[in-house]
């Protein structure tokens, strides 16, 4: 109790204890603690707050750093112990002084010194054993660092200052023992040469003037760069040897210019390749978007497949050598062909009408279109007094009332003489001329191909079956059906016109009467002929009546 009274009497010196503090003291004394034990415990707490408290606070500041990284002393501390006692004491005093200052201000000071002397962070990492990422964050952003790590960093900074100052001080007589000592010091951690900002500015200005300087010009640049490096470090240019590994040489200047020329050539190549890459990419996208159309092929059904055999059976020498059989033609012709572009000459065959199929809905279209008839008529050929036998299919595309559209080949023969040729041409052009549609007016401007007998030798046999596409409305089909249906016979000599007529039973539709046609099911080939040719195409049912669209001349034969 006597100690309690003394404690209470000693308390009101600077100020009286609060009621809570008095309760705490009475509780401690009441727990069995004596006055001596309590005073000793207070002294221990005060000592821990002064010395170990700083280390404890340093742990709190270094929470972002790697734990357990500095369990062993850094290598820089071992090197510091190897120095002379006076030098070691001096460096420890400088390190303690830096530890008392603001860490962020000291970090900026160390970073500025490293940039001034072109010192890489790798050298710091190898000297103090610190993580380079943590060191970079501390120097650039002021990331908190433990006192032990900061002490290692500041120890390296202080020692490096002394080494560099000694290099420039002893630069004049460093050719002797000093150079060997420097080699021994840098043997384990040789720094890589790094261009300083002052030297780079000089070299870039020189590169703008001359991209490939001569050796004399490079030597002049070496002197300018070394002078700038010395001034950057705050030393006299006479202390040039103090630059050490950062000394600029003629070989390094030559390599710098060579690297810049390579970089410029590479950038120029990239600039040239950029438009080509963009163009190829756009063309690739365009090709991919149109790839379904490239694979579409439109075939033409050829029904006159026995033409060559009938010619050989009847022994017609002239026709065998001059007339081309439809079998010689390719059975499939492409209207949209991208891989093989065949030039279309004046006497070459026009591409046949393609097999176009389109399914339209009557309810979707507000007004049904007129039925369109697309036919492929034989070309009009003038061969003097002789005539040409044309026996081929005429594909007809019929679109009735917006219904199903399909291709229907019709086989018929015509004999066109000089008078009938002119009539056919006049009728066709007059019909197209009176049509008011712009598209039909454009089609009317297409000329009918006229050939003479002398020009036929310049064309392949397939040109004898050239076609002319006719597109007309179903309402004007009467003009088309009024064309004269005749037959032409080609002979090699006008005197052979009186020979025995050629039997062409296999080329004609042997039906005494026109084939019955109905709007429900349109069949343009009788079953007797479809067995030896391609299967017939049938038009689907359509609500409109197309009986008036199919003339008898197009399905009958002219005997």
UniProtKB/Swiss-Prot annotation:
Subcellular location: Nucleus
Region Disordered, residue ranges: 49-73, 492-559
Protein origin, superkingdom: Eukaryota
Region described as Interaction with DNA: 121-123, 134-140, 146-149, 192-195, 252-254, 259-262
Domain named HNF-p1: residues: 13-44
Biased composition range(s): Basic and acidic residues: 49-62
Subunit structure: Binds DNA as a dimer.
Identification of the protein by name: Hepatocyte nuclear factor 1-alpha
């Amino acid at each position: 109790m006597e100690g309690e009274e003394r404690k209470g009497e000693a308390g009101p010196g600077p100020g009286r204890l609060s009621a809570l503090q008095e309760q705490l003291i009475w509780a401690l004394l009441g727990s069995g603690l004596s006055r001596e034990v309590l005073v000793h415990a207070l002294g221990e707490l005060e000592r821990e707050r002064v010395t170990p408290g700083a280390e404890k606070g340093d742990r709190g500041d270094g929470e972002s750093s790697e734990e357990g990284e500095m369990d062993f002393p850094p290598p820089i501390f071992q090197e510091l112990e190897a120095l002379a006692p006076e030098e070691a004491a001096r460096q420890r005093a400088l390190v303690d002084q830096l530890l008392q200052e603001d860490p962020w201000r000291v970090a900026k000071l160390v970073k500025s010194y490293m940039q001034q002397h072109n010192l890489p962070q790798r050298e710091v990492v190898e000297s103090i054993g610190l993580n380079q990422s943590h060191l970079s964050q501390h120097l650039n952003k002021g990331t908190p660092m433990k006192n032990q790590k900061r002490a290692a960093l500041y120890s390296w900074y202080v020692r490096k200052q002394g080494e560099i100052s000694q290099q420039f001080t002893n630069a004049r007589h460093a050719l002797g023992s000093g150079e060997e000592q420097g080699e021994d010091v840098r043997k384990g951690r040789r720094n890589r040469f790094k261009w300083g900002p002052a030297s780079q500015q000089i070299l870039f200005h020189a590169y703008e003037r001359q991209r490939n300087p001569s050796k004399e010009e490079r030597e002049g640049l070496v002197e300018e760069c070394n002078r700038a490096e010395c001034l950057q470090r705050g030393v006299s240019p006479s202390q040039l040897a103090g630059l050490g590994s950062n000394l600029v040489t003629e070989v390094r200047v030559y390599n710098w210019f060579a690297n810049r020329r390579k970089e410029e050539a590479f950038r120029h190549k990239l600039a040239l390749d950029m438009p080509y890459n963009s163009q190829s990419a756009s063309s690739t996208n365009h090709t991919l978007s149109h790839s379904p159309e490239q694979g579409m092929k439109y075939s033409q059904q050829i029904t006159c497949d026995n033409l060559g055999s009938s010619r050989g059976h009847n022994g017609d020498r002239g026709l065998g050598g001059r007339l081309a059989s439809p079998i010689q033609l390719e059975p499939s012709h492409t209207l949209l062909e991208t891989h093989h572009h065949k030039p279309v000459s004046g006497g070459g065959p026009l591409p046949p009408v393609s097999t176009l199929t389109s399914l339209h809905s009557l309810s979707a279209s507000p007004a049904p279109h007129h039925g369109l008839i697309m036919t492929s008529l034989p070309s009009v050929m003038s061969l003097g007094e002789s005539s040409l036998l044309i026996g081929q299919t005429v594909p007809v595309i019929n679109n009735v009332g917006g219904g199903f559209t399909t291709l229907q080949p019709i086989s018929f023969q015509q004999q066109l003489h000089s008078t009938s040729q002119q009539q056919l041409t006049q009728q066709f052009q007059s019909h197209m001329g009176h049509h008011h549609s712009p598209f039909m007016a454009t089609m009317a401007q297409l000329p009918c191909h006229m050939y003479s007998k002398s020009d036929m030798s310049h064309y392949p046999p397939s040109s004898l079956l050239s076609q002319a596409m006719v597109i007309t409305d179903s309402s004007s089909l009467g003009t088309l059906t009024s064309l004269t249906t005749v037959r032409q016979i080609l002979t090699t000599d006008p005197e052979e016109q009186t020979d025995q007529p050629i039997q062409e039973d296999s080329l004609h539709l042997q039906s005494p009467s026109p084939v019955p046609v109905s709007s429900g099911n349109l069949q343009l080939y009788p079953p007797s002929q479809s067995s030896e040719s391609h299967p017939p195409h049938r038009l689907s049912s359509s609500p409109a009546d197309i009986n008036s669209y199919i003339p008898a001349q197009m399905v009958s034969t002219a005997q």
